[in-house]
Every structure is written in C-alpha cells, then in structure tokens.
C-alpha cells in the first residue's frame, strides 16, 4: 500500500459523511454548507461553493446532495432546495420550502424526490424546483435523529419514515 496523494484539510467544518463521484471528481460537503469539487486528475479543489448568506453563517447545515450530469441537487435542514451546475459554477434554481428536509435525494426521470422532517414525501420538477406533488404520511410527535430514507427499484419508490413505516409507491403515476 503506497500513498499516492494527500491533500491539505478541506474545511474548518466537519465534512459530510457522503461523498459523490462524477467525471473523475469527488464532491464533498461540510457543516458550513460548503460544497467542494475535488479533481482526482488535478489533485486539487477545482470549485468551492457556498449557497448560504452571512445570516446563516453560524447555523450548522445538514446538507444532502445528489449529482447527475454536472448538476448538484441539494436539500438542507433550513428548508432550501437548489441545483448548481458545478462545471459552470452557476445556480440553476433555488427554492425555500421553509421546512427542513430530512432524507437522501433521489432522481427519477424529470423528478427530484425528497422528504421533510414531518415525513411528507415531495416530488419536484428537477429543471426548475417547482413542487409537482406532496404526499403526507404520519407525523411523529417526538422528534428524533433518524433520517428518512428513499430507495428506488424498478418502478417502485420505497420510503422509510421517522415513524418507522415503510411505504412503496408506483413512481410512474407521480
């Protein structure tokens, strides 16, 4: 085992446990809301992006992100949902839905799928962030640290919520 490369520290904040890979780039996020695009070929950070204004600077961000075709889709615990073209360093769209998102993100055809802390399941238009459909499920009375989980298999979307219920939805009818 030979060390090929070691970078300097990316951030003063904790790095998100999820790392994504696309086109020889590693995409990381941190608790400060920063997104880092690290080029494996160039062995350096080629982009650093922070969507948040100074008024959110002291708030710890829990960001969930997904990448497809040079677009990073992001949801957070502040209620924001946004899409960034990381190659062009440009925000495509951004929306504030005013309730914290609390799940991984999924893409299916032209839909971006997420859930919030109230166990509501959302389908958004991935090109503009507009809400297509909202499906409420049971709400938990006690807030916990469980993160809702989304998974897609064939034509089914599986949704495990914080209440502990598992839903299976035919995604083609959404």
Predicted stretch roles:
Residues 153, 157-158, 163-173:
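Blade-level signature of beta-propeller repeat domains, shared across WD40, Kelch, NHL, RCC1
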Residues 2-23, 44-69, 90-109, 131-154:
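Extracytoplasmic beta-rich repeat domains
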Residues 1-2, 39-43, 85-89, 125-129, ...:
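Short loop/turn segments that connect beta-strands within beta-propeller blades
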Residues 30-31, 69, 76-77, 116-117, ...:
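Structural signature of WD-repeat beta-propellers
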């Amino acid at each position: 085992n030979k060390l090929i490369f070691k970078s300097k520290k990316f951030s003063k904040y904790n790095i998100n446990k999820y790392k994504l890979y696309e086109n020889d780039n590693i995409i990381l996020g941190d608790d400060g809301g920063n997104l880092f695009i690290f080029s494996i070929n160039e062995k350096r950070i080629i982009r650093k992006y922070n969507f948040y204004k100074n008024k959110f600077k002291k708030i710890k961000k829990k960001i969930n992100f997904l990448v497809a075709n040079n677009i990073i889709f992001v949801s957070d615990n502040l209620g924001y949902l946004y899409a960034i073209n990381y190659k062009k360093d440009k925000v495509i769209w951004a929306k504030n839905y005013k309730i914290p998102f609390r799940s991984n993100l999924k893409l299916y055809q032209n839909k971006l799928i997420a859930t919030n802390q109230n166990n509501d399941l959302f389908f958004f238009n991935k090109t503009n962030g507009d809400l297509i459909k909202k499906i409420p499920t049971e709400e938990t009375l006690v807030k916990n640290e469980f993160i809702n989980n989304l998974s897609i298999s064939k034509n089914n979307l599986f949704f495990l919520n914080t209440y502990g219920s598992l839903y299976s939805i035919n995604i083609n009818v959404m």
